[in-house]
Amino acid sequence: GYPLAFVAAKLALGYSLDQIGEMGTPNSAYVAPSVDYMIVKIPRWDLTKFAGVDREIGSSMKSVGEIMSIGKSFEEIIQKGLRMIGQGMHGFVGNRDLEFGDLDKELSHPTDLRIFAIAAALEKGYTVERIEELTKIDVWFLNKLKNIVDYTKVIAKYKTIEDIPADVLREAKRLGFSDFQI
C-alpha cells in the first residue's frame, strides 16, 4: 500500500513531496498508487439471541461484531459481506423468504434486516427515489443495490447454469453473485 503516515510525517516536518523521494515503492511520494478495490465493513447483528431487545438500530451499541469484505465493485463486496455476517443469507438477493408486514415502516426505521427490506422493495418495484425518501440512504448506494436486483432478472432467463453465456456469468460474478444465487 501507500505509506500514508510516512508521507504525512515528512510533510509535517517541512519536506516537500519531491524531497521525500521513492520510499521503497515504485512511485514517488507525490504519485499515489491506483487503487482497484473497495472494502466495506458490515456490523453483525444477532438480536434474536437476546430476549426483549428492540430490533430498531439507534445510537446504542447492539452489534456483536463486524465483517470486512474486499472486492472490485460495491455490488460484489456487499453481496460477499452479507453472506459472511452469519444471518443465513446468501447475499443481497436469493435469500430465504422474509416477510415484511409493513415494508414502508421497515424501510423508514433502521433494523437488523433493513438491507433485506431494501431488496424486497426493489423486487416489488419501488423506485430508488422512493426508497431514498424512506431510508435517507444516498441514491449512489441504492442504485448499486438496484443493479443487483436488476441482474437477477437477466440470470432468471436461463434454466440452468450451463445455459448461461460466459459474458453473463462473468458479469454475475463481478456483481458478487454466488453459485447458489445463480
Regions found by a protein language model. Name each.
Residues 1-167, 172-176:
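ATP-dependent carboxylate activation and anion-phosphoryl transfer catalytic cores
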